[in-house]
Amino acid sequence: SRGGLYAFNFAATYPARVAALYLDAPALDLRGWPGYKKSHWAEVAENYGLTVAALETAAVSPLARIDPVVRAGIPIIGVSGDADTVVPLAENLAVLVQRYRAAGGLIEVIIKPGAGHSPHSLADPAPIVDFILQHHAPSR
């Protein structure tokens, strides 16, 4: 979840260092993070050198930083449960999928029916591993 925030923003900032992204139940829009404890907001704000108030309007949410990742040609695989109430699929990964594809980016998604926020990954992680290996770019 929060790792998706940091991983995506790393890719947007340093695209030459990223061959592919694996996002699992990613928090991609800080404004729509209903299941997240407000105490964690302070930590996220501190990591970005912002106040909690400034965090709500700053362009640090991955959904505001899609263009550099698409331009770099970084493929993404995302996994999410369709019953996640901590980081809702419809407000995060589903929005990224629509916007990323509309911008010309490659994104594959695996939806876990009936699954909530945890456990992360898949019982059989082979589809994730295969995607990463298929899109691994040693030159990056």
Where do the language-model regions lie?
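Conserved hydrolase catalytic core segment
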Residues: 9-19
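Alpha/beta-hydrolase-fold catalytic nucleophile elbow
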Residues: 24-25, 79, 112
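C-terminal catalytic histidine-bearing segment of alpha/beta-hydrolase fold enzymes
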Residues: 86, 91-140
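Short, proline-enriched alpha-helix->beta-strand connector loops that line the catalytic pocket
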Residues: 69-76
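Short beta-strand/loop motif that positions the catalytic acidic residue
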Residues: 77-80, 84
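Glycine-rich nucleophile elbow surrounding the catalytic serine of serine-hydrolase chemistry
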Residues: 1-9
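Active-site micro-motifs of SAM-dependent methyltransferase domains
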Residues: 4, 28-29, 117
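Mobile cap/lid helix-loop segments that gate and shape the active-site cleft of serine hydrolases
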Residues: 19, 26-68
